[in-house]
C-alpha cells in the first residue's frame, strides 16, 4: 500500500478481513454535484438555471405584438470572499445577468414581420453560491440545505386497507402525481362505483372525465369491456361460446350439442368442463330467453327506417327491450361480458349514475367543481379543462414522472410527453379495475423506488422558477403597453420577485438549516442528511409508523441506525456511505457483478427499482482468490427477503460490510455487538462532541476516521506536490516541483490557516500545521489539522483508562467518576467563543454614542477600555465588566428653577444621557480575542476603527508582498536552473530583484530565450495581479459597511471561554453509553494497578447488561492491548534499541491482521520514518476494526498476550484510599470518551426577583428569561399529601402570582417582620374573566 506523507507518521493497523473493492466516495458529493448541475450553463441540457429560463421564456404579449426571448445567462464576480462575507454578515453570492432579446412585430401585416430586435443584459438579482464545503453563507452565517426524500411523480395504486368503510371493505384507488400541476385521484366507493377527484376536491363519477375527453358511452363500453354476441335464428336464441368465460358460473340451462348433453342444468362450470367444450370445438349454444334478462346492451340500436335510437347502449335488458330487438329484425346483438369473479361491471354501473351524457355537460360539471359559484361558459369550461392536465405551462410530469408512469403501466418506452393524454387516463383506470378484479397488486408507498431525493440544485431551481413566473405576469402586461418602441429589456423586467423568492428559500425554508458545526462529523452528517419533512413532504403529525420504519430497500441507500430520537424519528435519515443519486434522483448503491458463480471486479450501481430483480450475496460471503464462492449455497437477498441460493444463481455481491450504514454509524467500532437503539444514540452523540484543546486520535477506530476528517474540509489539504518552503502558526507555503508547474502558472501555493474563529455552535475552530520545514509532500496530503482532527484523522474525544466497577455510589445511575489527573492534564478542556454585539443607533431622542465617558461609573470599571470606549484585545473579563461603553440620550425631563440655575452655572449636561454599555453576561468570564467594528458610510470613524483598519491593511499588504517575494524567488531559482543546464559559459548574474534581472541585457542562447521570455511575461502578469489585489483589498477595508436603517455602528466583541471538565458535564462513549460527571476525585483516591498507575474514569458495570451494548467492553479490551503495544515501543525507544529491532517489532505488529491486501510492508520506510512512526506509536497502536468486519475474540486475546496482559482483559486493582486489594479482578482498558456540548455552565441557573408574565403575573420559565422552576400540579399534590399547608399557601400565592401579597412580603422582610399576608392570586382573576367571556357573571361576596 502507498501511504501519504501524513499517513506514514502514524499507520492504523486494519483488522478488516474483506479486501477493499471501492474507495470511499467524496462524502459531500450529494450537495456539491447537485449545485454544480444547477449553476453550470449547458445548452440542450434541461436542468438547472438553463431549464428554468427555457420553461418560462419566450414571453409573448397578450396582443402578440411583442415578445421577450431568452438568449443566455452569465454569473458575475463575487463582491466578497467567504471569510469577508462571514465577518461582514453578508450573503456569499454572485450577480446573475441574463441576456434577453425584445422582439417587436409589425402590427398591420397579416404575416408576423419583425419590426426590430433589441438585445441587452439584464441584472436578475444575487444568487447565493455554495462554498467548497457544501454550505451557503446567508447573512454571515453558514447554512446547509438538507436534501428531501419525497414521493416521486408518477402514478400510484393503493388501497384504504379497509379502514374507510364500516364494513371493512377494501377500496382501491389510483393517484397521478405530477411534478407540478393538479393531482388526479381515481377511486372506488363502497358501492363499487368509480369516481375521480381533481386536486382532492369533491368527487364526481369517473365517466364524467371520459365524457369530457370526448368519449361517447358506446365508446367507453367498447374500451373497458369484452362482449358476448347473441343471434336469433328460427325464433331460437344462440350464443357464440367462449368456454373460459363461463368458468365458475352456475348454468341455469343445459348445454346440449347434437343431442348430446355436456353440462347439466344448475351445475357449476369447472376447468374440466371448459376443457371438454374446447375439445369438442363447440362454437355456439342455444340459450333460453330468460338467461339474457339483466344483461347490459353494449351498443346503440337504431330504428331501421327512422334511424332514431330504440335502445341506448348500457341499457339493462328486460322483456320489453328484447321484444324491440326481435321485432326490428336485428339478427345479431351485443351484450357486455361481466361476472362477479374477475370482470366486474364497474364502469357500466358508474355510467348509470352519471348524469352527463356528452362532452359539454361533462366539461361544465368539472368547471362547477373547480370554480364553484362562477357561471360556466363553454369557452371557460374548455380552457379550464385543457389547462388542468393538457397544458405544458400548467402541468408537468417531468422525465422522472413519465418514466415512473410508463413503468407502472408496463410500457416499453421510458421517455414521453410531460402532459397527460387520453391513453394515459384510460390505462390508469384499466389497471385500477384490474387490481379490483384481482389481476394486479397495489404499490408499496415506502419502497425507495417510489421515493426520490430532491437535492439543493433542484430546490433552488424550483424556487427560481416560482420567481420567474411572478416576473412573467408583470412582463406580459408591460409588453401590451403602447410605448414599446422606446423600451429596453431592462425597463420591462423587475428582478425583485426573483431575488425575494431565493432569499425566502435560503432564509426561511424548513430545509435551509443553520449548520450544525459542533465538530467535523456534525458538519458532514448535516450535509448528508435526508429529510422527509419540508415543502411538498410529510408533516410530523401526519406521518405514521410505516413511513418511519426501516424498509428492505433502505439497504445500502439509507442508514437503518442514524436517525434522531423524538418526534422526527425515521423522518430524518442519513445517506449510507456508498449511496448516490442517479439521473432521476433515486438512490442507488454499488454492487460487484457475479458471473456463473465467480465474483468479478466490475461494479454496478443499482437503484431500488432494479435491485428487486436480482439475487445479491452478502459482502462477507467467503470467496477464494479466483473469486469463486466456497460454499454451494450462499445467503442472499432477493426481492427484500433473505434466503439460501445456489452460487451459480447469484447475480451481484455487496461491495463492503459497511455499505448499509452512514458515516456516523460507521465510526462506531464493534457496532455489530451493540443493540440498535444504543448504536443510534452513539451515532447521534458523536455529533455533539466538543473539540478539545488537544485532539487525540482514537486507539480503537474503524478506519473511516481519515476519510471523514479530509472530506469535512476542516483540515488543509495540499493542492499540488512540493516542498514546505515556510511554515508558522498561521501560514504554510509550499514550493511546487518544477515538473508539476504548467506554463503561466505560479510555482508556489500559499495556505492561510484559520485561527481561533467561532463556529455556529460557539465552539472554537483552529488549525494547526502538522508538517515541518523542508518536508516533501504530495498532492492530497494533510498539511494542517483542524478542530477535532489529529494527523488527518477524526479525533472527537480522548482515550481514557477506564475501570468497570462501583465506587462508593458515585457511579449510580450512569454517573461517571473522574480522576483529578484528567482535569489537570486538560484532557477535556474546551474553548468556547462567544460573540457579543453592541449596536449604536440613531434614536428619536438623538444619536447614541460609543465612548469611554460614561456617567456614574468609576475609573476602575473603565480601566480596560481604550479612549474610544472599546475594550482592549487580550483583556481578561468577568461577569458585569464593561466591554463597550455606550450612552443613550434620555427623554428631556421638566426641570425645577433651582436645577435650571445649577445647570446654567456648572454646565451639567451628563444627566441627559443614560448608560447603555455592553457588559459581560451573567456567569461568563473569559478573554477578549477579537474586536470588529462596522461603521455606516458617512459616519465619522473613531480612533479604534482607524487603528483596526490600518492593522488589516498592513497585514494584507504584508501578506501580498511576501507572496510576491516568494514568487520572485521561485522564478529566480527557475531561471538559475535553466542557466545551469547550459554547457556554454554565461557571466554570473547578481540581482536583488527580478526587475534588475530582466533589465540586464544578456544574450541568451536561442534554446532558452523562449523559456526566459515566458517567465518574464509570467512575472509581469503576477505584478499586475498583485497591484490589483492590493487595490481591491484596500478599497474593501476602507469602504463603509452596509448596515440596517437606523444603525450607525456595530461593535462585535469575541470572548474566548476556557471550560475544564466539571461535575454536571455530560460525557459519553461511542456506544450510546452516556452519563454525567458526578465527582472529580483526587488522583491518590482512585483505584490503581500493580505498577501504581491510577484509573482515569470509573464506570458502572450495571450500565452494560441491560443496554446490550457490548461493543464498549470489547473496545476496552482492545484499547488495553493497543496501549500495551505502545508501552513496549516506548520502552524500546527509552532503552535506545537499535532501529532494525524496532523495525522488526513494528513489522510483527503490523502483520497481525488476516487480510493479505492490507498488510503493511515497512521495508520501503527510511530509518527516520521508522523512528518517527515509533515515536507516534508510543502512546498506543491505533487499530481499525471496520463495522461488521471487525477484530474477533481470538485476535483480541492474541494482542493482549503480545502486550503482556491477561487474556481475560481483567487486572488486579488496589483501593487508592486504603491501599487494599479489591476482592475480584476488574475489567480495565482504554475507552474513547467524548465530552458533549451539554455543559453544566450553560445550564446552571438561579432566579432572584425577576420578570413576570403579563397576564398570569407568574414568574417566567427558563434560563434565557431569567425564570423560575415550575411548581406544577403533581408537586402541589405532594405538599398536600404531607399536609404542609403554610408552604403550600406560600407557593400558590406570594411566591407565584399574588401581586399585592408579594410586595407586602418584600416590605415585611425589609422591616424585619417574618409574616406574610396572602391575597388573591392573579390566576383566579384570569379564571373569573374567562368565565365572564362565556356570559356567566361571577362576583365574590366579601361577607
From Swiss-Prot:
EC number of this enzyme: 2.7.7.6
Keyword Phosphoprotein set for record: no
Keywords: DNA-directed RNA polymerase, Nucleotidyltransferase, Transcription, Transferase
Domain of life of the native organism: Bacteria
UniProt similarity note: Belongs to the RNA polymerase beta chain family.
Cellular component, GO annotation: DNA-directed RNA polymerase complex
Keyword Transcription included in the entry's annotation: yes
Reactions this protein catalyses: RNA(n) + a ribonucleoside 5'-triphosphate = RNA(n+1) + diphosphate
One Pfam family, short name: RNA_pol_Rpb2_1
A GO term, aspect molecular function: ribonucleoside binding
Name under which the protein is recorded: DNA-directed RNA polymerase subunit beta
CDD domains, per the entry: RNA_pol_B_RPB2 (cd00653)
Assembly with partners or alone: The RNAP catalytic core consists of 2 alpha, 1 beta, 1 beta' and 1 omega subunit. When a sigma factor is associated with the core the holoenzyme is formed, which can initiate transcription.
HAMAP family given in the database record: RNApol_bact_RpoB
Role played: DNA-dependent RNA polymerase catalyzes the transcription of DNA into RNA using the four ribonucleoside triphosphates as substrates.
Enzyme class: transferase
GO annotation terms (biological process): DNA-templated transcription
Amino acid at each position: 500500500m502507498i501511504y501519504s506523507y501524513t499517513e506514514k507518521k502514524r499507520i492504523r493497523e486494519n483488522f478488516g478481513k474483506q479486501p477493499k473493492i471501492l474507495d470511499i466516495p467524496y462524502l459531500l458529493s450529494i450537495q456539491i454535484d447537485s449545485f454544480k448541475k444547477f449553476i453550470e450553463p449547458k445548452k440542450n441540457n434541461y436542468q438547472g438555471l438553463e431549464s428554468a429560463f427555457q420553461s418560462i421564456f419566450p414571453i409573448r404579449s397578450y396582443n402578440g405584438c411583442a415578445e421577450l426571448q431568452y438568449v443566455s445567462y452569465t454569473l458575475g464576480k463575487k463582491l466578497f470572499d467567504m471569510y469577508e462575507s462571514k465577518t461582514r454578515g453578508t450573503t456569499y453570492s454572485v450577480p446573475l445577468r441574463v441576456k434577453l432579446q425584445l422582439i417587436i412585430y409589425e402590427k398591420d401585416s397579416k404575416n408576423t414581420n419583425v419590426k426590430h430586435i433589441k438585445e441587452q443584459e439584464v441584472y436578475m438579482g444575487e444568487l447565493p453560491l455554495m462554498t467548497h464545503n457544501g454550505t451557503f453563507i446567508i447573512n454571515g452565517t453558514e447554512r446547509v440545505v438538507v436534501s428531501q426524500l419525497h414521493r416521486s411523480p408518477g402514478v400510484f395504486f393503493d388501497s384504504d386497507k379497509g379502514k374507510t368503510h364500516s364494513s371493512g371493505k377494501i377500496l382501491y384507488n389510483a393517484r397521478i402525481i405530477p411534478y407540478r400541476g393538479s393531482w388526479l385521484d381515481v377511486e372506488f366507493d363502497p358501492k363499487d362505483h368509480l369516481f375521480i377527484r381533481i386536486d382532492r376536491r369533491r368527487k364526481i363519477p369517473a365517466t364524467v372525465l371520459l365524457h369530457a375527453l370526448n368519449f361517447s358511452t358506446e365508446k367507453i363500453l367498447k374500451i373497458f369491456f369484452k362482449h358476448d354476441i347473441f343471434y336469433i335464428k328460427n325464433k331460437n336464441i344462440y350464443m357464440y361460446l367462449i368456454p373460459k368465460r363461463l368458468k365458475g358460473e352456475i348454468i341455469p340451462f343445459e348445454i346440449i350439442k347434437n343431442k348430446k348433453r355436456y353440462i347439466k342444468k344448475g351445475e357449476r362450470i369447472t376447468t374440466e368442463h371448459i376443457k371438454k367444450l374446447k375439445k369438442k370445438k363447440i362454437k355456439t349454444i342455444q340459450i333460453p330467453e330468460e338467461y339474457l334478462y339483466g344483461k347490459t346492451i353494449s351498443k346503440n340500436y337504431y330504428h331501421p327506417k327512422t334511424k332514431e335510437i330504440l335502445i341506448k347502449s348500457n341499457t339493462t335488458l328486460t322483456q320489453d327491450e328484447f321484444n324491440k330487438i326481435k321485432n326490428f329484425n336485428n339478427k345479431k346483438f351485443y351484450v357486455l361480458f361481466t361476472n362477479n369473479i374477475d370482470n366486474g361491471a364497474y364502469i357500466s354501473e358508474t355510467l348509470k349514475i352519471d348524469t352527463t351524457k356528452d362532452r359539454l355537460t361533462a366539461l361544465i360539471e368539472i368547471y362547477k367543481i373547480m370554480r364553484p359559484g362562477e357561471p360556466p361558459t363553454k369557452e371557460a369550461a374548455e380552457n379550464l379543462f385543457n389547462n388542468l392536465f393538457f397544458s405544458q405551462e400548467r402541468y408537468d410530469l417531468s422525465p422522472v414522472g413519465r418514466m415512473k408512469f410508463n413503468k407502472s403501466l408496463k410500457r416499453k418506452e421510458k421517455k414521453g410527453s410531460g402532459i397527460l393524454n387520453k391513453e394515459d387516463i384510460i390505462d390508469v383506470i384499466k389497471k385500477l379495475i384490474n387490481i379490483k378484479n384481482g389481476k394486479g397488486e397495489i404499490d408499496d408507498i415506502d419502497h425507495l423506488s417510489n421515493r426520490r431525493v430532491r437535492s439543493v440544485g433542484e430546490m433552488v431551481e424550483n424556487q427560481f422558477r416560482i420567481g420567474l413566473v411572478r416576473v412573467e405576469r408583470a412582463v406580459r402586461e408591460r409588453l401590451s403597453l403602447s410605448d414599446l418602441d422606446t423600451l429596453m429589456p431592462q425597463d420591462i423586467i423587475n428582478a425583485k420577485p426573483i431575488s425575494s423568492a431565493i432569499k425566502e428559500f435560503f432564509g426561511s425554508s424548513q430545509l435551509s438549516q443553520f449548520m450544525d458545526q459542533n465538530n467535523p462529523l456534525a458538519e458532514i452528517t448535516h450535509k448528508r442528511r435526508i429529510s422527509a419533512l419540508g415543502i411538498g413532504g410529510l408533516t410530523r403529525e401526519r406521518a405514521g409508523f410505516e413511513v418511519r420504519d426501516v424498509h428492505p430497500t433502505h439497504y445500502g441507500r439509507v442508514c437503518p441506525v442514524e436517525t434522531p430520537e423524538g418526534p422526527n424519528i425515521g423522518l430524518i435519515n442519513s445517506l449510507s456511505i456508498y449511496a448516490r443519486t442517479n439521473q432521476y434522483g433515486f438512490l442507488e448503491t454499488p454492487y460487484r457483478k457475479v458471473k456463473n458463480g465467480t465474483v468479478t471486479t466490475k461494479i454496478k450501481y443499482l437503484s431500488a427499482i432494479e435491485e428487486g430483480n436480482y439475487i445479491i450475496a452478502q459482502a462477507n460471503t467467503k470467496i477464494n482468490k479466483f473469486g469463486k464462492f466456497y460454499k454451494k449455497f450462499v445467503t442472499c437477498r432477493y426481492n427484500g427477503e433473505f434466503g439460501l441460493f445456489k452460487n451459480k444463481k447469484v447475480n451481484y455481491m455487496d461491495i463492503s460490510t459497511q455499505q448499509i450504514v452512514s458515516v456516523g454509524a460507521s465510526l462506531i467500532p464493534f457496532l455489530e455487538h451493540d443493540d440498535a437503539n444504543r448504536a443510534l444514540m452513539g451515532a447521534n452523540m458523536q455529533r455533539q462532541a466538543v473539540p478539545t484543546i488537544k485532539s487525540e486520535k482514537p486507539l480503537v477506530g474503524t478506519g473511516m476516521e481519515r476519510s471523514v476528517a479530509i472530506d469535512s474540509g476542516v483540515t488543509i489539504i495540499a493542492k499540488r506536490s512540493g516542498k514546505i518552503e515556510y511554515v508558522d502558526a498561521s501560514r504554510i507555503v509550499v514550493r511546487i516541483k518544477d515538473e508539476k508547474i504548467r506554463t503561466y502558472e505560479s510555482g508556489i501555493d500559499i495556505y492561510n490557516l484559520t485561527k481561533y474563529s467561532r463556529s455556529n455552535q460557539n465552539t472554537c475552530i483552529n488549525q494547526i500545521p502538522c508538517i515541518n520545514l523542508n518536508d516533501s509532500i504530495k498532492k492530497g496530503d494533510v498539511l494542517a489539522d483542524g478542530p477535532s482532527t489529529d494527523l488527518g484523522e477524526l479525533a472527537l474525544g480522548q482515550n481514557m483508562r477506564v475501570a468497570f466497577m462501583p465506587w462508593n455510589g458515585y457511579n449510580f445511575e450512569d454517573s461517571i467518576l473522574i480522576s483529578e489527573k484528567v482535569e489537570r492534564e486538560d484532557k477535556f478542556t474546551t474553548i468556547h467563543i462567544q460573540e457579543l454585539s453592541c449596536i449604536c443607533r440613531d434614536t428619536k431622542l438623538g444619536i447614541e454614542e460609543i465612548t469611554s465617558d460614561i456617567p456614574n461609573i468609576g475609573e476602575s470599571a473603565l480601566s480596560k477600555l481604550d479612549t474610544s470606549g472599546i475594550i482592549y484585545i487580550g483583556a481578561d473579563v468577568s461577569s458585569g465588566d464593561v466591554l463597550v461603553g455606550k450612552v443613550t440620550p434620555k427623554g428631556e425631563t421638566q426641570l425645577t428653577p433651582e436645577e435650571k440655575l445649577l445647570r446654567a452655572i456648572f454646565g451639567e449636561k451628563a444627566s441627559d444621557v443614560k448608560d447603555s454599555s455592553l457588559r459581560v453576561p451573567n456567569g461568563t468570564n473569559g478573554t477578549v480575542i477579537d474586536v470588529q467594528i462596522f461603521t455606516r458610510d458617512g459616519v465619522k470613524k473613531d480612533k479604534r476603527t482607524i487603528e483596526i483598519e490600518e492593522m488589516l491593511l498592513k497585514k494584507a499588504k504584508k501578506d501580498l508582498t511576501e507572496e510576491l517575494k516568494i514568487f520572485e524567488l521561485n522564478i529566480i531559482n527557475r531561471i538559475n536552473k535553466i542557466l545551469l543546464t547550459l554547457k556554454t559559459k554565461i557571466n554570473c548574474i547578481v540581482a536583488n530583484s527580478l526587475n534588475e534581472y530582466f533589465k540586464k541585457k544578456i544574450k541568451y542562447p536561442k534554446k532558452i530565450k523562449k523559456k526566459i521570455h515566458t517567465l518574464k511575461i509570467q512575472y509581469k502578469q503576477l505584478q499586475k495581479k498583485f497591484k490589483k489585489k492590493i487595490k481591491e483589498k484596500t478599497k474593501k477595508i476602507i469602504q463603509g459597511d452596509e448596515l440596517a436603517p437606523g444603525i450607525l455602528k456595530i461593535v462585535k466583541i469575541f470572548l474566548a471561554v476556557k471550560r475544564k471538565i466539571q461535575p454536571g458535564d455530560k460525557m459519553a462513549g461511542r456506544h450510546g453509553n452516556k452519563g454525567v460527571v458526578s465527582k472529580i476525585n483526587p488522583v491518590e483516591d482512585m483505584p490503581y494497578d500493580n505498577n501504581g498507575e491510577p484509573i482515569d474514569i470509573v464506570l458502572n458495570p450495571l450500565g452494560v447488561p441491560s443496554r446490550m451494548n457490548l461493543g464498549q467492553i470489547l473496545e476496552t479490551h482492545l484499547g488495553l492491548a493497543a496501549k500495551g503495544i505502545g508501552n513496549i515501543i516506548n520502552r524500546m525507544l527509552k532503552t535506545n534499541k537499535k532501529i532494525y529491532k524496532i523495525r522488526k517489532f513494528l513489522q510483527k505488529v503490523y502483520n497481525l491482521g488476516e487480510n493479505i491486501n492490507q498488510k503493511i510492508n515497512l521495508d520501503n520506510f527510511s530509518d527516520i520514518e521508522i523512528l518517527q512512526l515509533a515515536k507516534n506509536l508510543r502512546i498506543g497502536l491505533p487499530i481499525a476494526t471496520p463495522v461488521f468486519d471487525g477484530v474477533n475474540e481470538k485476535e483480541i486475546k492474541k494482542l493482549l498476550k503480545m502486550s503482556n496482559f491477561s487474556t481475560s482483559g481483567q487486572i488486579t486493582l488496589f483501593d487508592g484510599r486504603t491501599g487494599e486489594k479489591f476482592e475480584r479482578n476488574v475489567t480495565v482498558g482504554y475507552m474513547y470518551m467524548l465530552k458533549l456540548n451539554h455543559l453544566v455552565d450553560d445550564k446552571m441557573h438561579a432566579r432572584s426577583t425577576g420578570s413576570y408574565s403579563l397576564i398570569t403575573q407568574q414568574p417566567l420559565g427558563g434560563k434565557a428569561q431569567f425564570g423560575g422552576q415550575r411548581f406544577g400540579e403533581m408537586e402541589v399534590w405532594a405538599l398536600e399529601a404531607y399536609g404542609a399547608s403554610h408552604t403550600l399557601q406560600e407557593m400558590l400565592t406570594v411566591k407565584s402570582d399574588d401581586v399585592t401579597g408579594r410586595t407586602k412580603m418584600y416590605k415585611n422582610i425589609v422591616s424585619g417582620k417574618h409574616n406574610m399576608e396572602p391575597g388573591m392570586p392573579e390566576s383566579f382573576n384570569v379564571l373569573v374573566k374567562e368565565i365572564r367571556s362565556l356570559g356567566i357573571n361571577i362576583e365574590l361576596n366579601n361577607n
